[in-house]
Design a protein with these regions (language model features):
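N-terminal low-complexity, Pro/Thr/Ser-rich intrinsically disordered segments
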Residues: 6-9, 17-21
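Generic structural signal for coil-to-beta-strand starts
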Residues: 59, 81, 100, 140, ...
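Repeated scaffold domains used in trafficking and secretory/extracellular systems
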Residues: 3-6, 45-55, 87-98, 126-137, ...
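Acidic/polar residues in short coil/turn loops that connect beta-strands
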Residues: 9, 33, 55-56, 67, ...
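Residue position within the beta-strands of beta-propeller blades
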Residues: 2, 13-16, 61-63, 102-103, ...
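Solenoidal tandem-repeat scaffolds enriched in leucines and small polar residues
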Residues: 133-136, 141-156, 160-172
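Surface-exposed loop/turn elements that mediate protein-protein interactions on large endomembrane-trafficking
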Residues: 20-44, 65-87, 106-126, 156-190, ...
Length: 353
């Protein structure tokens, strides 16, 4: 069973269990109280979840309908009241702050104001947007394709498009939605020189941007080594922070953990029964035992889920039965103790039907 993703604020986390039912709850876990409660139910027979966001104490659940005929968001207030509001145009938010939600894609930045509900659109000051990576303070890190000729669009032009990309750059920029301006950070060849290497953005801390680099064996496409690297925006310098090699033939991705929007902890490697973690704060590497989640609702212990504002970490702690469906149970533990290998948890009081 997959480890669930949660929308985390440092004080609480919000999640949709996705247990395969037509009606699912939206659950909130208050870290200080150590209690999980239900905010409301959502109807997945008519809603396709898009995103969960939060401003102040209000949780916003964005969704659209089958076929994309309706775009809406459900505001869940701290008093338990729920208000459904439609959005007049296609809106798939990929970022948010305390003022608005943003849908940055194609040639436009759409902004939905939390206070007024007004949806505005600004044309982006560049072309050939490649990806939106995440917030860096009040700005957005994104990539765009820089080429001598425009990229061919539409079906049937795949070979021509690939030929253009072979001689193009991927430029990393910081975009400011408030001023609609960009600042170049760095660029690199669109296709890496080493075709057995792939790079993914994990987060930022201070002036450094952090990336996970996976090295495959070129045959099975499985990662054989994961390396955490950083780029110092002020000095313009790349640095290798830490790396982890495969053992016993396993494959692993990266799991970044943020606090106040900044990268604090990274799972470099997920082995059969051990996690390799790296702390951004002190530059130390840790080996922490855990139990994989089994298809028969066994295991699922000690895998990190989120960091809390009070110096603890939320981890998996087995399963609970929720209306006949196995759901992850959570526990809280001091971060330092967790990294030292302790399992002296404080159990979370989980919501059940």
């Amino acid at each position: 069973m997959a480890i669930p993703e949660v929308m985390d604020t440092g004080a609480a986390s919000v999640e949709i269990p996705f247990s395969g039912l037509e009606t699912e709850p939206i659950l909130k876990l208050d870290y200080a109280a150590g209690v999980q409660t239900k905010l409301c139910d959502i109807d997945l027979s008519r809603q396709i979840p898009v995103a969960i966001m939060q401003h102040g104490d209000t949780v916003e659940y964005f969704w659209d309908s089958e076929g994309g005929t309706v775009f809406a968001h459900t505001a869940i207030r701290p008093d338990g009241s729920v208000e459904e509001q439609t959005v007049p145009r296609k809106f798939y938010p990929n970022l948010y702050d305390e003022y608005a939600a943003y849908d940055i894609w194609g040639t436009a930045c759409k902004r939905l104001d939390w206070q007024t509900g007004e949806l505005t659109t600004a044309s982006l000051p560049f072309v050939q947007l490649d990806s939106v990576l995440g917030a860096v303070g009040s700005r957005v890190l994104l990539t765009r394709i820089v080429s001598d000729t425009p990229l061919p669009e539409g079906e049937g032009h795949e070979d021509m498009r690939d030929a253009v990309l072979q001689n193009s750059l991927r430029e990393y920029d910081l975009y400011d939605p408030a001023t609609n301006t960009i600042e170049k950070v760095f660029d690199e060849p669109y296709y890496p020189e080493d075709h057995n290497e792939s790079k993914s953005y994990l987060g930022y801390c201070g002036d450094k941007l952090y990336f996970g680099v996976s090295h495959t064996d070129g045959v099975s496409a499985l990662s054989r080594k994961n390396t955490l690297v950083s780029y110092d925006r002020t000095a313009g310098i790349w640095q290798e922070e830490c790396s982890a090699d495969a053992q016993n033939g396993e494959d692993s991705g990266f799991w970044p953990f943020l606090q106040d929007g900044r990268l604090k902890l990274v799972v470099l490697w997920r082995g059969k029964d051990t996690l390799t973690l790296y702390s951004i704060d002190n530059g130390a590497r840790y080996e922490v035992p855990y139990e994989e989640a089994g298809s028969d609702a066994t295991g699922n212990r000690n895998f990190p889920i989120a960091l809390t504002d009070d110096g603890r970490i939320l981890v998996t702690d087995g399963y609970i039965d929720r209306s006949g469906v196995a759901a992850s149970r959570y526990a809280l533990i001091d971060l330092g103790a967790y990294l030292a290998g302790s399992r002296e948890y404080t159990a979370v009081e989980m919501w059940t039907e």
